[in-house]
Amino acid sequence: MADRPNIILITSDQHRGDCFGFEGRAVKTPHLDLMAKGGTRFSNCITPSVFCQPARASILTGQLPSTHGVADNGINLDPAAGEAGFAGTLARAGYDTGVFGKAHFSTRATYQPTDTPECKTGSQSYPDDWNGPYMGFSHVELIVHGHLSKARANPIPPEGQQYERYLASRLADGGAYDMWATELPPSTGAAQTWHSGLPVKWHSSTWIGDRTIDWLRGRKKDTPFCTWVSFADPHHAFDCPEPWSRRHAPEAVDLPQHRPMDHARRPRWVRTAVGAEPIVADPAIREPGWPGQR
């Protein structure tokens, strides 16, 4: 199997590349430290986009946003481009391929319904036993609402995919979402940061890890595999459950160096994009919690 190695790609969302124990920071990541020591670290990786969908499409296809066409959130990746990416290429070479967690190759909140499994309306047409294929992956178990929000209604199946159905099935009448939104004392004083009352065993990170392990244990051992384990955190809202939410005392965290905006050395379009106020004709778009907001 040396010429056809097994591959596990692990990603986290909106996570500083140096915020690990193995990078010398004062954070406790012993399991990640072991994996970094025995695996491959992408220490010199620079994302081609600060936005989620373009960056994920680039990981899958190996192309820049200007080539694969996903220039911003809200633009779906062409399925043909997705199929030509690393997952489809390996699948055609005889690999078992899977993705677990947040794929975000397609848009959840759309003005018009689409037929993608990640669309809030399109996902409702997929049966409960659907597990792919999708964008070159032969097996998928997805989180459609990667980040829950108190500012909008939470997904109730049939909207969503595997994780949404799992979480909704824990308690009747949306009880699991109520537990997630429960703030345990003491309050942080920040709107999107709290000690969540959701049991850690129901959290999306636990679910992603467990589903990946079950898939690896249940597959044929004589076939090489490639799986993308895509954790949706630590992206805000910072809603970690106990005991993990109290693992680090705030005063013990070594903050990164603050880097002020240096627009003078940046291209004009960067200065315009960062410093200008967008022209919005529809006042509803300015309302907090509008689905299209980043």
Which residues make up each language-model segment?
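Formylglycine-dependent sulfatase
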Residues: M1-R294
